[in-house]
Amino acid sequence: MSNQHRQILVTCALPYANGPIHLGHMLEHIQADIWVRFQRMRGNEIHFVCADDAHGTPIMLKADQMGITPEQLIADVKEKHYADFCGFNISFDNYHSTHSEENRELSELIYSRLKENGFIKSRTISQLFDPEKSMFLPDRFVKGTCPKCKAEDQYGDNCEVCSATYSPTELINPRSAVSGATPVIKESEHFFFDLPSFESMLKEWNRSGALQSEVANKMQEWFDAGLQQWDISRDAPYFGFKIPGTENKYFYVWLDAPIGYMASFKNLCKRENLDFDRFWNKDSNTELYHFIGKDIMYFHSLFWPAMLDGANYRKPTNIFVHGYVTVNGEKMSKSRGTFIQAATYLKHLDPECLRYYYAAKLSNRIDDLDLNLDDFVQRVNTDLVNKLVNLASRNAGFIQKRFDGKLADKLEDESLFAEFIAQSEQIAAYYENREFGKAIREIMALTDKANKYVDDKAPWVIAKEEGREAELQAVCSMGIQLFRVLMGYLKPVLPKLAERSEAFLQAELTWDNLAQPLLNHGIAPFKALFSRLDVKQIDAMIEASKAENAAVNATVKKEEKNSKKSTALLTDFEPIEPEISIDDFAKIDLRVAKVIKCEEVPESKKLLKFQLDLGFEQRQVLSGIKGAYNNPEELEGRFVIVVANLAPRKMKFGVSEGMILSAGTGGEDLYLLDVDAGVKAGSRVM
């Protein structure tokens, strides 16, 4: 594909408007921003848009819990999101909201076209209904016992213990996660998008090169299982757009969310007098790219292109999918302080450090990326401070002091300069293909060559010898020329460092002008371009993150407590189980155990892994109380009560050799049973 005169529209996935941006979000936005900045440097017409995903039940409920309107909540969150992105130098041309008139108009238009073309069906379905809140419950707002493995406190769509999927109506003893009430089953008419009608088109499009091979292979699993009609409606009360021609039906958030890409661009078109249809018409020859995470790839690879096709719009040119971010080899953890919010990072560290580190580890595959904090410090200090910036500083002083800031009028080593310029197209190809890690390795290899050149020439030795002034100027100028080329190559990754370098060089860095050296050119006095990272900064950030997450958890619990009724109703309690005999009870062997070690099970949202001392032996027990204990290590040393003669059970995440007793309704409302001081591990509960 030609690199000239391309017309490109780029989007990032829309962050949900009910919580802060964290470093996991930033991977995608940094990846997209680097690609966009590179395209701008190449002279292409490119538009970069995003928006907040601002509809849905979670937003409605959170606003109610906070005592504000959903509109107030999403406005506050959007302001914070945009500030975080600006802090990381994400160069959006427009940042909008799905709760906008542009999105309402486009959602209604696409729905009407799909309906006219026969792709909208309706039928009556059975749903769980909260009688206290008078609302139908989405899958994730119902909890109960898994119908397959009987694990308690599972969501309404899948079990996190045995991985089974099911309907909310199949849950045993279901309860509303909103009010705690027992839901009832009610019927309601819903509207469905006829996804199976697009199977042939989707199969062809999925294998057309529009998706990474790993994504296309994953989508094949959906085709093998058979595509199903997609429920695009929700019942009132719901925060979103009402479906035209209905009284109490709303578009499901995942219908209007991707349309938010179009809405944000349409808002930009109004502001800058751009042609919206040129980018979205079915016969458009412009390019459209979505950067997204692997958790939402099926929406973008199946539902979204089918919606566009059915509504007579163009499909994406390509969807670029990335993996998750881990920290120090583990899932981001609030208790360990590695669930780091973007705003917390910005209070302690330069955003360009993270931009560089992510770029150095990014490829065009969907592998997860590990933010190893020790490696992070070492790589930034070695590559950016010791090698790159030092290349400029070790030469600039001589140019400023001995030659009044004037560079030599010719290159000292034309072949070396030519070698650096010759790598331009290879580095450009890496950027184009999102192989940022390969681009960084190539650039740093050139940086090593530049520093070796200076080391071999030893300008500090030349400076001490009379009659070698011209040679000194030529050598130091050559070092500056090479630094300029390197900074040009790194400009998409490090825009602020590039900006400071441009001020020092007194010249703009563009991809095309790098081949023309700055001969007989004046540069500004050198000032520090980049600061070294200190481990103490990392430690301070982690501690701040721990404190902030703890404060948020405390606030959430307080809000939830205040939102509940002040007096308990009899219906709040589970009924007493059928009577058993004393002989039945005698079969249960309850023992006191001491917690030796307690840690999260990273792959599970519910489980903690305990290593217990029963006095006579040690055992491993998996317990679904993660929601109640954010700092599992704090449980170490505590005594708990265990069902000791329960048969070992093989679970998805390991073998559990017993059951720890706790009381409560589930989730965060769980409390471990305690024992008086003096009891020993292994003591039997009588």
UniProtKB/Swiss-Prot annotation:
UniProt-annotated location(s): Cytoplasm
Listed GO CC annotations: cytosol
Entry keyword annotation includes Lipid metabolism: no
Keywords, sorted A to Z: Aminoacyl-tRNA synthetase, ATP-binding, Cytoplasm, Ligase, Metal-binding, Nucleotide-binding, Protein biosynthesis, RNA-binding, tRNA-binding, Zinc
Binding site for ATP: 334
Superkingdom of origin organism: Bacteria
Residues reported to bind Zn(2+): 146, 149, 159, 162
E.C. code: 6.1.1.10
Protein's job: Is required not only for elongation of protein synthesis but also for the initiation of all mRNA translation through initiator tRNA(fMet) aminoacylation.
Record family assignment: Belongs to the class-I aminoacyl-tRNA synthetase family. MetG type 1 subfamily.
Record-given protein name: Methionine--tRNA ligase
Gene giving rise to this polypeptide: metG
